Regions:
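Conserved catalytic/ATP-binding subdomain
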Residues: 42, 65-69
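N-terminal module of bacterial RNA polymerase sigma factors
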Residues: 1-29, 36
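Arg/Lys-rich amphipathic alpha helix in sigma70-family domain 2
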Residues: 73-93
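Sigma70-family region 2
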Residues: 12-13, 49-66, 85-87
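Residue-level preference for hydrophobic side chains embedded in well-ordered alpha helices
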Residues: 22, 26, 30, 51, ...
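Acidic, proline/glycine-rich intrinsically disordered inter-domain spacer in sigma factors
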Residues: 94-102
Length: 102
């Protein structure tokens, strides 16, 4: 059986099939995990793609056997940042809506 680390190394060696296999394996569960933070399935799907895009562009070093933990930790940090930005945006919208017209 091929491990997550094998798929990731395959991708790092230039074979995109490794990343595709990881996306196939973790895409849906990661989306559900992110939806738990965002409470919006569409935003969760977009953020899941952002997590994999991060892996695609940055190609971080991940210790052996730690791919899943790394993936979910990165997803959690991205979700918390996204939620924080969304909360700030809503706060600013509420502030501007409450201003009287001059």
């Amino acid at each position: 059986m091929v491990s997550d680390g094998d798929f990731y190394r395959q991708y790092l060696n230039g074979d995109d099939a490794g990343l595709e296999a990881l996306m196939e394996k973790y895409g849906d569960p990661l989306t559900v995990y992110l939806d738990g933070y965002l409470h919006d399935i569409h935003e969760a799907e977009e953020l899941m793609l952002d997590v994999f895009a991060y892996l695609f562009t940055k190609k971080p070093r991940i210790r052996e056997g730690g791919f899943k933990a790394y993936l979910y930790k990165a997803a959690r940090h991205m979700a918390l940042r996204h939620r924080s930005k969304r909360r700030l945006m809503f706060s600013l919208d509420a502030l501007t809506d409450s201003l009287p017209f001059q």
